[in-house]
Structure formats: structure tokens, C-alpha cells
Amino acid sequence: MVDYTRIRLHGFNNLTKSLSFNIYDVCYAKTEAQRRAYIEYIDEEYNAERLTEILTNVAEIIGANVLNVARQDYDPQGASVTILISEGPVSPEEAEESAEARPGPLPDDVVAHLDKSHITVHTYPEMHPDKGVSTFRADIDVSTCGVISPLTALNYLIHSFDSDIVTMDYRVRGFTRDVEGHKHFIDHEINSIQNYLSEDTKERYQTLDVNVYQENIFHTKMILREFDLDNYLFGESSADLDEEEANTIRRHLRREMMEIFAGRNLPANQEV
């Protein structure tokens, strides 16, 4: 096994590391008024200002300098933020830490010190007009050129959003040379994105990996293990529902979540 912490590079580290992080929050809102209220709530909870704060903390975690911030709230709903970043000097200790496959910090652990390419986020609130199911999706992309991997921000991102389903894609492209001229197509150890998840996250979520190791492509998706109907009802409680209605709503929500997790529509007669 290559000891990535001891590779001496010739010139700049030319590897590009990209993390795509997609979260889904699912909700049931029975009436048209409740559905509108849910969309308004999500639109306010994850507006451009809040998303800018999250992405700025991501920049801090990966050790990047923020060069420019562009953000926009959209009408009727949705928001996007793009942050241009640049790599700064990386200490030997930071380089060694980035080569290790381990979870990054949690939101409460982030303290400031900034000095890679770009970070973007887009939000997509939507709702089903008949079955009452509403879904909020946020897409975050972190792309860096240099030593530190965007995976160090993964733990923070998961804890920053209230996510029912999460899909993550990580890839490394390009190569860098050591002082002897040998090419290195990856500069840190990894066999799964799960290496970077904290233990509490692994306990809360069921996970599935699809990895193409020889191409440096890693994919992990997660869905919450526990299902409590009250966590998904907007504007009412399960105590307000009779048993038949509660079971119907539960089936609608579980089907929505499993189809998002599977990435396809499931047969109508398939139990979920």
C-alpha cells in the first residue's frame, strides 16, 4: 500500500477532486394551504443567506480562500450559491490529515481559518398536487484542485441538512508527479465514502455503495433506518389521523423515499 503522507511531489498537485452531495427531505402536507406553507418554510430555512453560511464553513473545513460569492433567491422558490475558492499553503500536518480516510468535523466544531476551485449549491422544492407528498432537494458540488479532499467537509454537510435520503458521488481526475517522475492518480487512501462518515451517521442511515475503484469513482447512498410518521407530517400530528388514513400516508411516504433511494419508479404492487 502506498504511504500517501510520504509522497514528495514535483511542483503543484494537479489532481482534481469532486464531491457531489444530494440531499432529500420528504414531507406530507394534506391541504393546499399546508403544502404552500411547507414550501415557504423550506424556502426560508434554506435561503441564499443560510446556504452561503453553510458553504463558507465548507470552505473553512477544506482549507480554502474565498475569492468571490454569488448568490440568488428565486421566485417563486429555490436558491443557489456559488463560491469561487483558491488553494492556499497547506502545512505538513494538514497534508497528512487529508491523506487519511476519516470523518471530518461536525458543525459545532468548525472554527475559522480560510485558504480550492468552486463550491455550489442549488435547492429544488417541489410537491405532488394529489397525494400530499412534498420533497425538498439540495444539490451541493465541491471541486478542489490540490492536496485537501472535499470529503473532509462531508460530515459537516450531512449534519447541516435534515436529510431523509442522501446520495454522494466522489471522483478524482488528472494526475500529479512525484520527484522521481512517477504519476499518481490519487493521493489519499479511500475504499468507500463511508470512511468519512461519523459513527452516529452510520447508525442512523442504511447505506449502499457502488464503487469503480480502478476509475477512482465512489458512490454511496443512504436512507434513514427509522420511520416515525410524526417527523413527516406538516401542520398536523399522527394523533389527528385515524388508523386507515395514517397507514395510507405512511405507504405514500415510504414509496416516495424508496423510489428516490432506488433512483427509479417501483411497481405499484411492490411492498415498500
UniProtKB/Swiss-Prot annotation:
Keywords recorded for this protein, A-Z: Autocatalytic cleavage, Decarboxylase, Lyase, Polyamine biosynthesis, Pyruvate, S-adenosyl-L-methionine, Schiff base, Spermidine biosynthesis, Zymogen
Cofactor note text: Binds 1 pyruvoyl group covalently per subunit.
Positions of the record's site feature: Cleavage (non-hydrolytic): 116-117
Catalytic activity: S-adenosyl-L-methionine + H(+) = S-adenosyl 3-(methylsulfanyl)propylamine + CO2
Any single Gene Ontology cellular-component annotation: cytosol
Pathway assigned in UniProt: Amine and polyamine biosynthesis; S-adenosylmethioninamine biosynthesis; S-adenosylmethioninamine from S-adenosyl-L-methionine: step 1/1
GO BP terms: spermidine biosynthetic process
An example molecular function term from Gene Ontology annotations: adenosylmethionine decarboxylase activity
InterPro entries the UniProt entry points to: AdoMetDC_fam_prok, S-AdoMet_deCO2ase_bac, S-AdoMet_deCO2ase_core
Posttranslational modification: Is synthesized initially as an inactive proenzyme. Formation of the active enzyme involves a self-maturation process in which the active site pyruvoyl group is generated from an internal serine residue via an autocatalytic post-translational modification. Two non-identical subunits are generated from the proenzyme in this reaction, and the pyruvate is formed at the N-terminus of the alpha chain, which is derived from the carboxyl end of the proenzyme.
E.C. no: 4.1.1.50
Post-translational modification Pyruvic acid (Ser), affected residues: 117
Catalytic center residues: 117 (schiff-base intermediate with substrate), 122 (proton acceptor), 145 (proton donor)
Cofactor: pyruvate
NCBIfam families: SAM_DCase_Eco (TIGR03331)
Membership in a protein family: Belongs to the prokaryotic AdoMetDC family. Type 2 subfamily.
Subunit record text: Heterooctamer of four alpha and four beta chains arranged as a tetramer of alpha/beta heterodimers.
Biological function: Catalyzes the decarboxylation of S-adenosylmethionine to S-adenosylmethioninamine (dcAdoMet), the propylamine donor required for the synthesis of the polyamines spermine and spermidine from the diamine putrescine.
Protein name as annotated: S-adenosylmethionine decarboxylase proenzyme
Species for this entry: Halorhodospira halophila (strain DSM 244 / SL1) (Ectothiorhodospira halophila (strain DSM 244 / SL1))
